[in-house]
């Protein structure tokens, strides 16, 4: 694929089971995703939707779901016309046990060179995943920043 890709790897001192739960439980997601709510059954073929203040921000389909190991989703940005015009991207979460920790690898890609959307998520994912790591290890998020609709 000659497209655009963002990869982020972090190690979180938690079990793969608890990390999986954090990736797929709406109440937990809302804590580290700056108040955004997510709806999905997290089963292959099911849809997922993410909302900020009641407005649809992103949506897609669950393409793979292997508990505690791998979650693959199609991803369509719904709120910025220039991002939506790029079409569906693909977001992959891979979890590997590493001793007392879990290794989380996130890969967000699109089959489009120089994607503006991948450029934007490459700034957003580090904040989200830093919050996830902090929440799971300390019980509190690292950042309280909330993206507005114009960001």
Residue ranges and their predicted role:
Residues 19-20, 29, 48, 62, ...:
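Hydrophobic pocket/interface hotspot
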Residues 54-56, 64-71, 77-79:
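Short, charged/polar surface micro-motifs in flexible loops or helix N-caps
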Residues 10, 59-64, 89-96:
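Hydrophobic/aromatic beta-strand elements that line small-molecule binding cavities or substrate pockets
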């Amino acid at each position: 694929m000659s497209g655009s890709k963002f990869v982020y790897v972090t190690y979180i001192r938690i079990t793969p089971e608890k990390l999986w739960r954090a990736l797929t439980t709406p109440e937990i997601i809302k804590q580290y995703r700056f108040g955004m709510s997510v709806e999905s059954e997290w089963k292959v073929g099911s849809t997922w939707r993410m909302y900020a203040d009641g407005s649809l921000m992103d949506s897609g389909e669950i393409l793979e779901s292997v508990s505690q190991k791998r979650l693959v989703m199609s991803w369509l940005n719904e709120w910025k016309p220039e991002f939506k015009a790029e079409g569906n991207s693909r977001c992959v979460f891979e979890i590997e046990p590493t001793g007392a920790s879990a290794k989380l690898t996130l890969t967000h890609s699109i089959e489009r060179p120089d994607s503006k959307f991948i450029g934007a998520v490459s700034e957003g994912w580090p904040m989200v995943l830093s919050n996830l790591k902090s929440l799971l290890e300390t019980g509190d998020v690292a950042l309280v920043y909330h993206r507005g609709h114009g960001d």
